[in-house]
Amino acid sequence: NGTQKIFYSDRRVLYFSTHQYPYYPGTGGLHEIGEGQALGYTVNVPLRRGAVNGTFISAFRKILEPIALAYKPELILVSAGFDTYYQDPLGGMRVTPEGFAAMARVLLNIADQCCSGRVVSVLEGGYNVVGLARSAKATLEEMFDETHYTDKKLNAMEQEADEKNKPVLRSVISGISPYWNVF
């Protein structure tokens, strides 16, 4: 929410967020897509409670990836919050450490194509200490190529997207497509 606010009218930054919605502080809705010349440079994916690995992978591959490849970032900065971990007391989502690693792989693939692999990840949140540690470890292992999620494995994970969030993903694409000729 603070990051979105800082760059809301700045088209030099593409802001992408997946999060439970509605949730505190109430920002991150579908209609929040930037302002002025930066319309379309804020992309919110406001997911319903209980979203699983496949839903997040689908959002990253079907929404973020085509936009990011068109945008061609010089660097990818990740605000790595792990409160979507499936046992987090506040998050309300169902992402596993493998899901976080798979999301990292999608970002790494984008970075390899756009910005010579430059990715910086900053730890933000997560309220289940064990889950945060496992998820951060899985993400780092993927970033250091100790594991490697292939397209085949990402495709399989994506097939497990939960039904209640598929309309959300379609709505995000519909709302953002006037600003990006990639859908």
Language model region names:
Residues 1-183:
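A general "terminal functional-core" signal
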